Amino acid sequence: MNIFIDNKSGAPIYEQIFTQLKSQIISGTLPSDEALPSIRSLAKDLRISVVTTKRAYDELEKEGFTVTIHGK
């Protein structure tokens, strides 16, 4: 999974993450049975706030692209 953040883009970072993950899910690049990285792990890798990552994940779930399974 590759996610690139463009700090010069006018789009908020959470939206960039959301859009890229959504595209990868739709195209099949990211298999539907594959777990996303943890919120903390992705935030650390991208050097962004956990809150920003959580917002992107929340948007994916709200639009039906992901489901949260607690405790995994």
Locations of regions flagged by a protein language model:
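Extreme N-terminal segment that seeds HTH/winged-HTH DNA-binding domains in transcriptional regulators
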Residues: 1-35, 41
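Short secondary-structure boundary/capping segments
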Residues: 5, 65-66
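Short hinge/loop at the helix->beta-strand junction immediately C-terminal to the helix-turn-helix recognition helix
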Residues: 29-30, 59, 64-65
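A short alpha-helical element within helix-turn-helix/winged-helix DNA-binding domains
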Residues: 35-46, 60
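Short, Lys/Arg-rich nucleic-acid/phosphate-binding segment
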Residues: 36, 68-72
